[in-house]
């Protein structure tokens, strides 16, 4: 093979007007079929869901070499791109030279032509990118990340890198992974018998972050508008299709934004991401719609059709209580003060309003200490964006800008002042109204891909009792 000949991506060969030209493509064999005279090889290089058909006239190739080309093998092909005579593809490559980079023993290679369950593929997460399904999902994941950066960049917001190692628990939930270099077999102790973290690497108790919000607020108080986008960690012992121990979060924080502006931003943002997916990932989305979720494309278009409903929590409870009176059955009880379950959120979106909902003004008892208190003293300016199929997709609020009120709320919620002294400084010096929200990246991907298990939209899922690879 000509080592100097530039490689052409299959996506470009399929759509780039190269018919009649000699090209060099490289990729992994999906299938090989044929007869004594000719072999047809389906080659994929990850640039598109579509394979390139390679036509190899066996008289021109060594039989021993061709026998090594099996499903999973990696090869390079030089040949002429021609219009295809067969059904199923518009163009194909008439091979003049083939080089084998790596073979795949059919006796042991786990991804043979037959279909595989998603459960099985989770057990071989290191190989599942080679399947059509996961090639599609990881390309969509890339495009969604680009959409997020593009949206905020166009807004003039700055990408801010919040630390992954922290001494604060933003959510006050306490479900954090500890970071330590101490030997568990010989922990240093204080006179009171407690672990002496002064002897640890950082000289104090530290954990992996559950959110970059608090640090993000500090940046917003100087840069005006920022967003974080990075991994977060929750040591929540939940083995469900909706929970991961390691996931990615997008968290904008914007100075001078009040709750109404925050709702506008969240709606504009999520619609932008969905539209980006439809504009840039249609081949991949169509594959997922055909194989996993027939209603996927309609559901994506559904969220773009009209403005989201703005709904106060109290009114939402009234609607749900009315539904119960009319015979609707919910697993979890409905009452003012309840933290709504996914079934309640989905009823409001899918049955009652038939459009996404932004719920606001939640009881202060079920929300975090940093949310701004309303004038009624009972509710806070929190907001959740509720979507079909998954319920809450975004959670946010206007932040409490008043120092005394924030301290009072922290004390009320059992958050020690000594742990957030630096956070309180932003209210002590030049405080300003500001708002923000958090979007779990994998929740967004669940919606855009139509997949039903969050473990299938992240490359290497981390869940209880599972940290393979």
Curated annotation (Swiss-Prot):
What's a GO biological-process term for it? asparaginyl-tRNA aminoacylation
EC class, as a word, reads ligase
Q: What is its EC number?
A: 6.1.1.22
Which Gene3D superfamilies does the entry mention?
A: Bira Bifunctional Protein, Domain 2, Nucleic acid-binding proteins
Q: Which family does it belong to?
A: Belongs to the class-II aminoacyl-tRNA synthetase family.
Q: Which NCBIfam families match?
A: asnS, PRK03932.1
Q: What is this protein called?
A: Asparagine--tRNA ligase
Q: Which species is this UniProt entry from?
A: Porphyromonas gingivalis (strain ATCC 33277 / DSM 20709 / CIP 103683 / JCM 12257 / NCTC 11834 / 2561)
């Amino acid at each position: 093979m000509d080592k100097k000949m530039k490689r052409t991506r299959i996506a470009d060969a399929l759509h780039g007007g190269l018919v009649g030209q000699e090209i060099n493509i490289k990729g992994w064999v999906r299938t090989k079929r044929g007869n004594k005279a000719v072999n047809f090889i389906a080659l994929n290089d990850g640039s598109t869901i579509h394979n390139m058909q390679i036509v190899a006239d066996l008289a021109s190739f060594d039989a021993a070499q061709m026998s090594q080309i099996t499903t999973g093998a990696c090869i390079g092909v030089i040949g002429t791109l021609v219009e295809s005579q067969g059904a199923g593809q518009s163009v194909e490559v008439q091979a003049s030279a083939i080089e084998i980079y790596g073979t795949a023993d059919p006796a042991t290679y786990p991804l043979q032509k037959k279909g595989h369950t998603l459960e099985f593929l989770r057990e071989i997460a290191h190989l599942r990118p080679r399947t059509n399904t996961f090639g599609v999902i990881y390309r969509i994941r890339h495009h969604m990340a680009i959409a997020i950066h593009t949206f905020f960049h166009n807004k003039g917001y700055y990408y801010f890198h919040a630390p992954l190692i922290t001494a604060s628990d933003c959510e006050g939930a306490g479900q954090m992974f500890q970071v330590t270099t101490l030997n568990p077999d010989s922990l240093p102790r204080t006179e009171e018998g407690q672990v002496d973290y002064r002897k640890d690497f950082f000289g104090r108790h530290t954990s992996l972050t559950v959110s970059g919000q608090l640090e993000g607020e500090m940046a917003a108080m100087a840069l005006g508008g920022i967003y974080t986008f990075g991994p977060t960690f929750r040591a929540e012992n939940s083995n469900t299709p909706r929970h991961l121990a390691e996931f990615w979060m997008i968290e904008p924080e914007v100075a001078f934004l009040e709750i109404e502006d925050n709702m506008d931003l969240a709606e504009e943002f999520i619609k932008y991401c969905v539209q980006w997916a439809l504009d840039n990932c249609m081949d991949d989305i169509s594959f997922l719609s055909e194989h996993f979720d027939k209603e996927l494309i309609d559901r994506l278009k559904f969220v773009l059709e009209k403005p989201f409903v703005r709904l106060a929590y109290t009114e939402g409870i009234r609607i749900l209580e009315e539904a119960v009176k009319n015979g609707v059955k919910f697993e979890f009880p409905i009452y003012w003060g309840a933290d709504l379950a996914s079934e309640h959120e989905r009823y409001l979106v899918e049955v009652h309003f038939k459009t996404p909902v932004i719920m606001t003004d939640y009881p202060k008892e079920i929300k975090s200490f940093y949310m701004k208190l309303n004038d009624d003293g009972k509710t806070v300016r929190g907001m959740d964006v509720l979507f079909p199929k998954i319920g809450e997709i975004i959670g946010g609020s206007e932040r409490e800008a008043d120092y005394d009120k924030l301290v009072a709320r922290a004390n009320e919620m059992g958050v020690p002042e000594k742990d957030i002294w630096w956070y309180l400084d932003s209210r002590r010096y030049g405080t300003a109204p500001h708002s923000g929200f958090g979007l779990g990246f994998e929740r967004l991907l669940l919606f855009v891909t139509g997949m039903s298990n969050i473990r299938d939209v992240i490359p290497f899922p981390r869940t209880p009792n599972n940290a393979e690879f």
